[in-house]
C-alpha cells in the first residue's frame, strides 16, 4: 500500500531506498529529518554514498551499485533489525538514486523489504513537479507503445516523421546524448510546446510558447498524490498561454472539437475519465491542503532477478545523481540562481585519490567503454571506496557520454593526465 507523507513521518521505521532527499526533495527531507529528531522515528538508510539524512539515520548501510538487493536482504534479517521492524509501522521511501544503474536494482531491493515486512507501506518519490499527476492521467506507455527511450530510438531509425516535445528537453535530460542528437536530426518535423528555448527546441520547426507556473490557474499533484490548486499571479509574457488552451486551439485547427472551452470543462473531463481524480471534482476541495487522489490498485513486483557483474579492481563503479541546483532551464534563466551552479567534477574517497596518484582539483581522464572525458577530481568522505560520484547536469564538462542507458551499471577507469 502507498503511504502518505504524514504516515511516513509517523512510522516507527523509515527505510530509505531513494536519492538524496536533501538535494532532490528538500521539503520532504525536512519532514523526515524532523521525524527522526522529534518523533523518534528510526531511519534505516541504504545508500551508495552518504546523503543529507545520513547524520540522522539510526543505521546507514552502504552498498556498491547493483548489489543493493543482497545488502538489504542480509541487513533486514539480522536479529537487531528484526526487533526494530517489529516495533510498528514500516514505510519505505523509494526512488531512483543512481542514473548510472538499471532502476530494476532498486525494485529488487524493495522486493527484499517486502519479503521481510509484507505489510510495509511505500512512498514513491518522483523528483519533478506533477509527475505523479501525469502518470495517473495516463502519460505512460500504453499497449506496448514504448517509453521515451523507445520513441527516441524509433526517431533515430527514421520511423517518426513528426515529434512533439511537450515540455520536454531530452538533450538535457536523457543520458544518451548521441541518441537524442540522432533522433532530432532524423525527424522531418519537430514541434515544441515549452516555456523556454532550450537545446532541444532551438532548431525546432515550430515552438508554441506555454505559460509557466505562476502564470496560469489549474491544479498540481504532488508525489503522495495530493491534488492542490495553483493560482495565476502574473500575466504570461508575450503570446504565451496555458498549455490546455494551446491543445484546444490545435484540436480545432485540426477539425476536432475536444469539448473544452474553460478550465472548469477541463477539470470535469479529467475527473470523469480518470477515477483517481474523482475526489477533486469540487474545485474547492483542492484549496488549502488539497485532497488526496483515490489510492490506486496495488501492483506486484515481478521479473527475473538481475545481477550486476563484479567490478574490476582497477575500475570505479559510477554513481550519477542530481543536485538541488543544476543547469535546469528555470535555474539558468534566473539571475539570482544561475551563479550557484557548480562546475562538473568527479568525487572519490580521499584514500582512492591517493591511489589514483593525483591531488585534489587536478584534471583526470575518466573512461568508459571507449569514451573519455577530462574532468576535475575532488575528494569526498561520503563517497565509498571503489566508487565515484558524478553530479548530473552541472556546468562545464558534459558527463553523459560516459553513461550507458542500456547497461545495468557503469564502471569507469580514472587515470592521471601525463
Set out the residue ranges of the language-model regions.
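Helix-loop-helix junctions within predominantly alpha-helical proteins
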Residues: 261-263
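Generic alpha-helical structural element
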Residues: 17, 21, 61-64, 95-102, ...
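Active-site phosphate/pyrophosphate-binding segments
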Residues: 55-156, 278
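A cross-kingdom feature strongest in bacterial/archaeal respiratory oxidoreductases
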Residues: 3-5, 10-16, 22-52, 56, ...
Amino acid at each position: 500500500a502507498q503511504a502518505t507523507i504524514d504516515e511516513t513521518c509517523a512510522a516507527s521505521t523509515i527505510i530509505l531506498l531513494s536519492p538524496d532527499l536533501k538535494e532532490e526533495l528538500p521539503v520532504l527531507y525536512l519532514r523526515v529529518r524532523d521525524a527522526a529528531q522529534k518523533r523518534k522515528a528510526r531511519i534505516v538508510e541504504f545508500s551508495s554514498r552518504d546523503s543529507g539524512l545520513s547524520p540522522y539515520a539510526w543505521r546507514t548501510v552502504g552498498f556498491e551499485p547493483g548489489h543493493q538487493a543482497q545488502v538489504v536482504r542480509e541487513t533486514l534479517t539480522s536479529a537487531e533489525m528484526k526487533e526494530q521492524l517489529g516495533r510498528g509501522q514500516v514505510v519505505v521511501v523509494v526512488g531512483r538514486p543512481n542514473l548510472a544503474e538499471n532502476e530494476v536494482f532498486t525494485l529488487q531491493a524493495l522486493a527484499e523489504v517486502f519479503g521481510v515486512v509484507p505489510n510495509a507501506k511505500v512512498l514513491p518519490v518522483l523528483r519533478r513537479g506533477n509527475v505523479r499527476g501525469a502518470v495517473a492521467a495516463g502519460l505512460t506507455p500504453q499497449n506496448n507503445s514504448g517509453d521515451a527511450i523507445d520513441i527516441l530510438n524509433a526517431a533515430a531509425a527514421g520511423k517518426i516523421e513528426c515529434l512533439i516535445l511537450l515540455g520536454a528537453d531530452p538533450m538535457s535530460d536523457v543520458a544518451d546524448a548521441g541518441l537524442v542528437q540522432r533522433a532530432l536530426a532524423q525527424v522531418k518535423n519537430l514541434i515544441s510546446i515549452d516555456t523556454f528555448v532550450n537545446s532541444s527546441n532551438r532548431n525546432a520547426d515550430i515552438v508554441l510558447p506555454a505559460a509557466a507556473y505562476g502564470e496560469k490557474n489549474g491544479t498540481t499533484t504532488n508525489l503522495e498524490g495530493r491534488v492542490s490548486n495553483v493560482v495565476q499571479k502574473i500575466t504570461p509574457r508575450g503570446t504565451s498561454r496555458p498549455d490546455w488552451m494551446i491543445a484546444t486551439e490545435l484540436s480545432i485547427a485540426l477539425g476536432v472539437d475536444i469539448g473544452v472551452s474553460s478550465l472548469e470543462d477541463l477539470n470535469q473531463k479529467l475527473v470523469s475519465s480518470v477515477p483517481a481524480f474523482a475526489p477533486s471534482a469540487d474545485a474547492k476541495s483542492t484549496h488549502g491542503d488539497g485532497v488526496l487522489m483515490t489510492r490506486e490498485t496495488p501492483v506486484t513486483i515481478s521479473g527475473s532477478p538481475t545481477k550486476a557483474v563484479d567490478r574490476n579492481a582497477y575500475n570505479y563503479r559510477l554513481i550519477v545523481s542530481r543536485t538541488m541546483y543544476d543547469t535546469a532551464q528555470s535555474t539558468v534563466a534566473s539571475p539570482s540562481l544561475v551563479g550557484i551552479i557548480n562546475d562538473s567534477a568527479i568525487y572519490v574517497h580521499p584514500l582512492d585519490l591517493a591511489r589514483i596518484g593525483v591531488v585534489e582539483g587536478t584534471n583526470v581522464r575518466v573512461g568508459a567503454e571507449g569514451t573519455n572525458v577530462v574532468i576535475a577530481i575532488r575528494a569526498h568522505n561520503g563517497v565509498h571506496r571503489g566508487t565515484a560520484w558524478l553530479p548530473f547536469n552541472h556546468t562545464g564538462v558534459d558527463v553523459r557520454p560516459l553513461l550507458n542507458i542500456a547497461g545495468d551499471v557503469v564502471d569507469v577507469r580514472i587515470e592521471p593526465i601525463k
